Amino acid sequence: MDDEGHGYWQDYDEDESWLDAENDVFDDDIFEEAEDNEHLVEGGDFHLKSALRGEADMLTNPIYEKEREKLQEDVGDLGVALGHLNVRPFLEKMGERISTDHTNTPLIENIKQGGFGAIHHMKSTARLIVAEAATVTETMLTSGVDTTLAGAYHFFEQNHPHMKCTVNMVLMFLTILNNVKNIRLNVDLHQILKNNISIKGSTVCMYITVATVAYFSTDIVVFDIDGQKYNTPKTYFLNACDKIQERFNVILYSYLAEGLSIPGSPPTYIVNRIIDWGDSILYQMGNDGYDVIALYEATVVGVILSRDDKDLSPTSGGGDFLENIQQDLGPVQQNHIRYLIALLHDMTPHQLADLHGLYRIWAHPIIDIDGGVKKLQKVTQSLKGDINSKPESQETVRSFRRLFVMDYFVKHQFYPPITLPEKSNCYIGNCIRTSKKIDESHINYNFSDWDLVELGGAFSIPYSWNVLHLAKDKAISPTRSEMYTMLCKTKRVFNAELRRGVLKLMNTTLTPLREFLTEVAEHGLDIDDCIIGLFPKERELKIMARFFALLSFKMRLYFTATEELLGSKLLRYFPQITMSSNLLDMQEKMSSMSRDLESQNKSVTYVINMDFVKWNQQMRESTCEGFLKNWSKLFGLPGLYSRSHQIFRDSILYIADGTRDLTPDPDTGIMVDNNVCWIDDGAGKEGIRQKAWTIMTVCDIAAVARHHPGVFHLVGGGDNQVLTVTYHTNQIDTDGNITEEGKSKIKAKVKKFIEALETHFAARGLPLKTSETWCSTSLFMYNKFMYYKGVPLRSPLKQVSRLFPYSNNTSMTLQSMAQCLGTGLRSAAQKEVSHIALLFMRNIWGSVLGWIILYCHPMLPSISSETCNSGVSTIVRGRKAINMKTHRIDLVALILKILYLPGQLGGPGLVNIYQMTMRGFPDPVTEAICFLRKFKNYLICVGSSYSSHLARMAGVSFSASRSYEPLIEDVCSLNLDTPRSGTGGKREVPRKILLKSRLGGNQHLKELLGIMKGPSEGEFYRAISSGKVLDVRVMHEITSSTLYAVTNTFTSRVDKTATLKRLTFKFSMLESLADAELKYIRYLSVRDDKTHDIMFDGCSRIIADECRTKGWGKPVLGVTVPTPFEYLQISWTDEHICDNNHITVRISNQDRQVTTETLGPCKPYLGAYTKEKFKMTEVAAAYGDEDVLSKSLRILKIINWRYQDGSTMSEIIKAPFRAVTDIDPQRMVQESTVTKGDYDHRRKMDARVHGGIPNFVTTPLSHISISTSTWYKHARGKNENIHFQACIIQTMYQIIIRTMSNIHSQEKLHVHECCQTSISEIQEPRANLDLTTPQMIPTFPTLMGNPLVYIPEQSITFDYSRTQEVDYSRRVGSLDCQRSTDYGWVDAYSSLSWLIMCDVIGWTKMPDSFYIMQQERVDHYLLSMYIISIWKVLKSEFDLHKTMLDWGPLLKVYSSDTGVQVLSQSMGIVVLGKLEGGLSVNMMDICNSLTGLTSNQIPPFSVNLALPRIHKQVATWWKLTCSDTMYCIQCSNILKGYWEGTLINTRIDNDLRCSECADGGISPRIVNAHISNLSDHLIKIIPDREEVQLPLLAGGEDLNNLEVVLSLEDEWPDSDDITILNRIGEMNDIDGRMKNYLEVMALLNPDVVIIRPEILELEILRRVCEVVRLASEGKLIIHILVEEPSYLESGAIYEMERAFPRHNLFHVQFSFRKPPEGLHKLWLLPQDITLARADVGDWLVIPFTQLLDFHDTITPDTRLHHQREAIRQDVFWSTKEQGGLGLVVLQHICTKTELSYRLDRSKVDVEINKMMIKDPVMGGKYVILKRRCSWAIFSTKYELLCSAERIKGNLSADGKKITSKDFSRTYKEDIIIFIISVLMRSLDCDEKRVMTLSYVECLPELLTLKPRFNKSGVISVRYLDYFWFFKRVYSYNNPEVAIPYSAVIKGVNLGSPRKEGYSLASSDGAP
């Protein structure tokens, strides 16, 4: 079967283009001269492709005039001329006439019914859709959708009874019109048509009724109605036919959507009124009415804008915008606009977005070519002055340099080639010289210094052309001399041989690309090539013609080549530009930018949508001069881009559509008259420099934005730029909203910014277009994608309108028409929520398509009913051919195959619901098998009469022969018995014609095409597929890198009929297509007449594998992927048997209005693409910039990834590279240790996408959370054929379909695996390479010396960045050094520590997830050794204190309990923050701490070539390993130069010491391993401790005490004063917390417990629940609360509920909503965000440190606050914990409660409770004191000594007598606390004297502390709280250590037993 999917020779993007763009500017449909031909010809004009011209313009064309004269001869007077606005109403009246005709002739009946009556009853069609929807979710069987659809269609028929007949009529007319030439040849016709068609002269006459006749010529249609004739040009007729079909689609779809109550769909009456609105305008105003129609889009946008907050709008919301667009309208026109505004007033944003797509429903105006020329000339010939010298231009050029240079540095870590003035000493220059990152906030940064930066040659120009880009079959302009010759001979401008680019290419020998561009840059284009044709744009709404440019061949080469250079090399440094972004990237970017619009509380985000007046034509040389010069310098060719406007000025411009008379001129080619031909036009041309001018526009915007505050984000391409600006404010009222004053200030800021934009662009000669430039706080719109307050708006109507088979642009075969419909359906599905209505539209048009095929096929002459019915078709069963005679083709059976037989199984290829659901599913065969198998079963369930058809259809049979070319082309294809289709046959025609072509001036191209001759290509396919097992993906990649792929791609590009005509004298393409089409239709009619070789019963994965093996005769690896629709089943109710192995789903809201029009709490899943985890070598990446080498280079990554180097397969993989260059491929092969990731999962082929994205509006996904983490059976790490993106998308889609059908589900769902055979292990070829290795070695074609496909190494140049990378690898010797392959913990810790420090400094950027994964793997103490050692070297080389360091990577690795303890206790770093919310450190503190630390032993290091900064790694190794080098000045200088990169000139495994020190005995240990491959070696217990001793970390002088003294002046301490150790100590006291929970549960006996979803807390609660006894009549509800989950966040947590006791006393809930009501609700460890959910009377258990964080958010009525109302008694209760930390139980606004203490507790805790009841403020202080002083409490001598060690370590024995005031506050307070504790603990303490303590005298040299007292006896108020605290603590404890008071007051000796006072060093304390 020849599938229509992407082949290996076709260009393939990562996904379908996200842009809904116009056709390529170089593509046009030129009217070619008709030729007499005895063969069949293809009309091709089934829909309007060109702009409409007036009758006078058309008569200037001699062909049209000649056809008109012939028609008059044949039929006489042509009658009334129907204008373009009258044709549609005329055809509608004619359709109504036929619909009401009762003559009942076969033709009339056929037109009346068409394909609409093929399915017997509309209820039958609806049942088909219900069964199809049931394949997604079985619950749709009882949804009642069939009744709804049938009812909606019935209403449509009632209100529009004649529309179906009109559609059928125009479809039949279009077929006849496009086959006029064939009917003239008396070809066979369908009997119904044959009886009603005759030929009169050269005119085809169709007799519809007695009084209705239609006359068709090639360019004019005439209708005779009751003796009155009406004529219209073909273009007018096509225009009307398009709109009739579009209106049918729009109105029918509106009825369906309204019937199904799809949220956001506009009411049908509004759709009809809007259509009538436009019709009435055109009826009243004629063609001029399009001036009003053209404002429809802007008006709809303006209505949406009018909903903005007027207080924030810089204008008046949408009001000013609506007024601006009406400025040029008269009163009558303005009234029309006002009426439209009134119509739209009550519509929601979703409805308005949908209606926005109707802007082409009123067809197109007749263009005014002369007016368009004058308007164009007015713009292009206006004088603008010297724009380049203006300050705004200088600012913009500086902005370009800034953006480019800084982004270049970010991507490469070095600057591009830059020249600076020798004597300049500016900050920017110094950063560039020293390769330091430019900090724009630096005090010395000066924006104007960018003027000093001269860019150099950063980019190289490739040697070779991309021949496939050149082969685009687009229109060009003849040269001047060719135009002169052509005008002299024919007086016309049409000549396909001169106007088709590919024909010109075949006749022109090209010099290499670099040579060509060098010639143009130095000398410009030859004057003969300076010519530009202007061709009117099609399908516009503007009356004044707009033109795109047709360039001469060489001019086109110049502009396309230079634009391609910008796109491939420069554009990547401007991420704001989205011209090359894929769909997923754009959706993510638009979603991110628009999400800021959701809330405008603390900040306001504005969307500024900019459009420019004649953007292309405003681009003058003076506007672009600064940029063009800079770009030229970047490519090393002055003049490369600067030549652009000189070429424009030198060019002669002419109107190229043939409607204007051109006079030949021997000097200029065409005589200049300044009307239709002119010169000296230096302005830009439409679409010629899009990328260049887009870059410049971005720089303009950036230049303005830098002067204004706010956060800016830009997205755009071309003249449509969308900017979001966010302003923050602190002017918030008590409700959390921005105050009026705050709004006013923000509005003033944005208004000032917009004014600055307008002023800047006006000065730059690029005025903004008022009618399309607007500012909004709600609407984000880019390229027809709309978001309102962050919500993507559904808008399918535009795509739905084009759902008809004749909108196809290729040959009108069954497959191409079906795929055209399928493409339109997928596009519409992307902008729709529910696909049910679209399925109905598909069935309608699929039925019509079946009717077209049998009754009025576009290839009518060869496919008629008689030939189909009397033919013979061949099917194959058991590899034996069977001839089947076709007696009669069953229309219903054909329609069912069109609708439901997927293309992968031999069908026409119309889409089903599975294919509409997502994009990117990798195996369409398995998907198709699953669909058909389930669909046939559900048809039986719904009682469909068509179930027997589908039962026979659900199977495949295989071809009797095997040719592996289709499999290699499409790796998923099957070898079916399907004949080659018409479209497939079309592929062979260009190939045959090119080989026989009479053209061939381009010898290099002729030589390339010559390899298609002979049997060599077939032999290659036989050889490459000769293995016993087919590793088809690798085979595909190999083949796509050969010259055969180049030639096949070239032939596929030659697809224009007119082009093919000129290639050979004999043209019989249509006969070949028609013959293939006839065979295919006959085949479809008999396909299922006999039982297939394989019928679809059972697992689709097994069936797919069987089909592949049986069809191809060999097993096929790596392509079979089961669809989740097969093996996943949602359990919609709680009554299911759960195997605890499932995907977990949570639904936050099921109201379909809410879910589709508002964002939910979850981040919507937009899909994902998998990425390859490793890169090519630097050398391979450098050579890959040459297009000729890129594909063959890319497949070299497969070596050592899929196949080992040295194997036969590796040599075959290298062969395509050897065929195109003389470079040794071995240099490009990556080492096996660097490869990472599975090939089947990670490899991105050019033939399919790896990943998947939803193909529907994603708003409902924000209300769904899904986790695959609970699918334990298929956990991460297993190599299985699961497509997880599809699992997520398809599961969510099932829920959406149910929601849209008003079928609700539980909030929590389980998705279980229902098929145990679908998922299987992926087979790896490494297990047995002999099976996949070809038995015959293929021969690869090569053309040495052909510059199109062969490049010698000496001809290749590199970009500067590539040169630096390759040169770096060469200079450090990393390419050929000796490496170790046995990795261990040394390599793991060396690499991880180096990578961390590289990220800290900013050399690299690893994802956060990588570091988070290392938290539990690493030994933090061991890692600290490496970090400290590397830091010593880094600090010695440059001043890191002045470098912006990001310690985030280090903190992420250490974000665990043990990690924080190592940071704090071992490394002395003060860590703040929380483990959950992120740690933070002071940069100076961490730098000082690391500097002060020393290690007793340097850990062993290794050098990893896979990590960055290899030379710095090597230098670090030498400095750490050989410390003696630091004492040799020569060695030190060598290493310093090596570090800086100035002396990198030797192998890294050589001895780098000087000649005297070097002995050659040592060298670094070198490895080359991906960091992920070393993770398993991050051991925590190091073996051989005798050999490898861990050094001890000693504290430096800057080591701080970690306790912080809390200020007691305020009621609450600042939460910032709480260190991370306090928090960890509090949270790590698991036993204390469990005891506390037990006490609380026993005390309160709660009926509801609310807890956060943390594993540890859930486990503690589970154990408590097992112990606690509940009242027999009670039931405990455990409510697990999750806030704002993403789709994968909560996986493992969901499963914790299984661990709770399983009996009727416990009920575990998991909900996003408010917890259930209860008498006693208990919140365990609530977070800040959940406190607001607590009700009056709820009880909270909060750790005290968290309470400090949250106390501001607790309501003022809570008794814990000082400011409180007079309410009844509250209770505050604390239990003692380890470390003196506490948990708090707080009853929140509770009623009076009498508490009895049921459990024993200490007397201290009782005291606290009493105090808290009496005075909560003092009680709170007491708890703070307990936390602060707990370290100084002691009962034993050992505890006293531990407390003393804390003080002892803080004393500096420097021999100087100091007092406590010389210490920091922390030290002073610690000493005071310690002394007070000892004093209050002493025997016979004199409390009155102790309380007069004044200060403590410290004698560091004696290690003695002496308390000093106030002689006056005044009590020390400062320390009163400490005295009070220790008095109460020690009053409840019996002393176990005797401390004499008399000794203590003399002093406390911490280490000297010989001094006076109390000595801790002696056993009894005596001195």
From Swiss-Prot:
Keywords: ATP-binding, Host cytoplasm, Hydrolase, Methyltransferase, mRNA capping, mRNA processing, Multifunctional enzyme, Nucleotide-binding, Nucleotidyltransferase, RNA-directed RNA polymerase, S-adenosyl-L-methionine, Transferase, Viral RNA replication, Virion. GO terms for molecular function: ATP binding; GTPase activity; mRNA 5'-cap (guanine-N7-)-methyltransferase activity; RNA-directed RNA polymerase activity. Coiled coil: none annotated. GO terms for cellular component: host cell cytoplasm; virion component. Its EC number is 2.7.7.48, 3.6.1.-, 2.7.7.88, 2.1.1.375. It is found in: Virion; Host cytoplasm. It catalyses: RNA(n) + a ribonucleoside 5'-triphosphate = RNA(n+1) + diphosphate; a 5'-end (5'-triphosphoguanosine)-adenylyl-adenylyl-cytidylyl-adenosine in mRNA + 2 S-adenosyl-L-methionine = a 5'-end (N(7)-methyl 5'-triphosphoguanosine)-(2'-O-methyladenylyl)-adenylyl-cytidylyl-adenosine in mRNA + 2 S-adenosyl-L-homocysteine + H(+); a 5'-end (5'-triphosphoguanosine)-adenylyl-adenylyl-cytidylyl-adenosine in mRNA + S-adenosyl-L-methionine = a 5'-end (5'-triphosphoguanosine)-(2'-O-methyladenylyl)-adenylyl-cytidylyl-adenosine in mRNA + S-adenosyl-L-homocysteine + H(+); a 5'-end triphospho-adenylyl-adenylyl-cytidylyl-adenosine in mRNA + GDP + H(+) = a 5'-end (5'-triphosphoguanosine)-adenylyl-adenylyl-cytidylyl-adenosine in mRNA + diphosphate. It comes from the Viruses. Residues 604-790 form the RdRp catalytic domain. Its main location: virion. InterPro entries: L_poly_C (IPR039736), Mononeg_mRNAcap (IPR026890), Mononeg_RNA_pol_cat (IPR014023). RNA-directed RNA polymerase that catalyzes the transcription of viral mRNAs, their capping and polyadenylation. The template is composed of the viral RNA tightly encapsidated by the nucleoprotein (N). The viral polymerase binds to the genomic RNA at the 3' leader promoter, and transcribes subsequently all viral mRNAs with a decreasing efficiency. The first gene is the most transcribed, and the last the least transcribed. The viral phosphoprotein acts as a processivity factor. Capping is concomitant with initiation of mRNA transcription. RNA-directed RNA polymerase that catalyzes the replication of viral genomic RNA. The template is composed of the viral RNA tightly encapsidated by the nucleoprotein (N). The replicase mode is dependent on intracellular N protein concentration. In this mode, the polymerase replicates the whole viral genome without recognizing transcriptional signals, and the replicated genome is not caped or polyadenylated. May form homodimer. Interacts with the P protein. Belongs to the rhabdoviridae protein L family. This is RNA-directed RNA polymerase L. It comes from Rice yellow stunt virus. The gene is L.
